[in-house]
Amino acid sequence: MCKVEEFYDFKNGLNKEKEFFGSGVPIVNFVDVFHNRGLTPEMLKGRVTLSKKEIKNFEVKQGDIFFTRTSETINEIGYPSVTLGVPTDTVFSGFVLRGRARSVDPMDNLFKRYVFFTESFRNEMVKKSSMTTRALTSGTAIKEMYVQYPSSKDEQHKIGAFLAQIDDTIALHQRKLDQLKELKKAYLQLMFASTNTKNDKLPKLRFTGFKGYWELCK
């Protein structure tokens, strides 16, 4: 068991006025980190106009681990996301914290996608974060947290790849579920007659062999 500070340094993100946003270089925003445990360049939709110096100061590299810095509730503070792809001229928002290995990263990137979202790490995150009007964490707080991992990167990668495969399966079934819900919604409109008396008392779609108007009762 090791403290996070043994391997990672943390940096606060970029703060700019709203007129700088909308075009420019990609930026890792709060919602990107909050909703995804792993990030690839094509997932980043936010853009910000910056100088070369600012891009250098707030650059994003493959393997960087981000944490949401603030939240409305304490249970949603410090959600993690790791950079899985190779970003180009990409920066990160002031609403997230960037963790980066000081030298050689002891953890596989796929493994990092999950190790900072385990129940034990989440519990520690909640305990060591502050709560006033909003929940808040910091690089200083995260560096004091403990993390456990196998020394073998091969084992780490197998764990990460296995869990990623489950996530992919869940996402596939979720898409199928969403499609079924939309299909059901469409059939509800087609297979039931309208209660509007000005419309025909017939559904637009019926099973073969059934005829006649539907009864309209008050």
Task: Explain the meaning of each model-derived region.
Residues F34-G46, I65-S93, L110-Y114, N123-K127:
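Short, ligand-facing micro-motifs at secondary-structure edges
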Residues M145, S152-C217:
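Amphipathic alpha-helical segments with low aromatic content
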Residues S51-K52, L97-S103, E144-Q148, L205-F210:
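Short, well-ordered beta-strand elements within core beta-sheets of diverse protein domains
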Residues H35-T40, L136-S138, K198-D200:
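Short acidic/His/Gly/Ser-rich catalytic and metal-binding motifs that mark active-site loops
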Residues E5-E17, D32-I65:
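Sequence-specific dsDNA recognition surfaces
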Residues N15, D89-F95, R122, S129-E155:
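A short glycine-rich beta-alpha junction/loop motif
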Residues M1-L14, R206-K218:
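Non-catalytic DNA-recognition/assembly elements of restriction-modification systems
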